């Protein structure tokens, strides 16, 4: 009797506790595509096979399907499917629908073995599910660190190229690429220290991001150099945005240890027609143009916007 009680409590706990701990009621029920239902269908088929074939080994038939579910579904769904499968098997064994007696009368020791076997089987997909969830979470963190600059929280160079592949840019007909360089940034590091320099970069990036908003993409290319890509249908939009950025930076005071600093920025602008299918290549070509114009802005006194179009130079 003690063995029967122990096996019942143990198997019940293994099946129910993970399900209860991960239980969450979604606000909106997710829509499953036909191919996403294949693991669940395989699970149903494997349980039916257990009934048809019988024998003690048939209790493990659903295990491959449960592991498939663990790989494809969330831990919450996996725990629920594991609980339902285990409960169904226990009920089927108890009512001799799945025959594991192999010709001998059904006894408590056999039920003890069946319950422990089902509980052990249930642990495997749950462990796999949480392992997969942990790996996916880690991969997202790695991707986030690769795509965003840690200091400024804007896109990194690689993140910008990934963002240019976004389906939201399919309507792009024109692209303006700006290359921004904070004027005399080295003197800020020399006079106020690198901690101040890092703070300047962070505040500068946040200010640029606020000005650009959802109209463009902001990235730190390295050091004090930033890039802004503005997809549009109007060639003038990008140039107006560049001047808005330059003036916005010039008028924005920066405070460091009770001292007020004013920053200026030199901007080079590359502008031209672009297509979503070749957006990365178009960006690279316009970056070369923007780099040339940035050099001109710095050579001609800094704190200015230079472009090869629309009057050669805007100040």
UniProtKB/Swiss-Prot annotation:
Membrane topology: Multi-pass membrane protein
Segments traversing the membrane: 10-30, 41-61, 80-100, 116-136
Alphabetized CDD domains for the sequence: GGDEF (cd01949)
Gene3D superfamilies tied to this protein: 3.30.70.270
Chain positions recorded as Mg(2+) binding sites: 181-182, 224
Catalytic reaction(s) noted: 2 GTP = 3',3'-c-di-GMP + 2 diphosphate
Main localization (coarse): membrane
Cofactor info, note text: Binds 1 Mg(2+) ion per monomer.
Phenotype when the gene is knocked out: Deletion of the gene increases swimming motility.
Cofactor(s) annotated in UniProt: Mg(2+)
Subunit and interaction comment: Homodimer.
Name of the protein in its database record: Probable diguanylate cyclase DgcF
Gene: dgcF
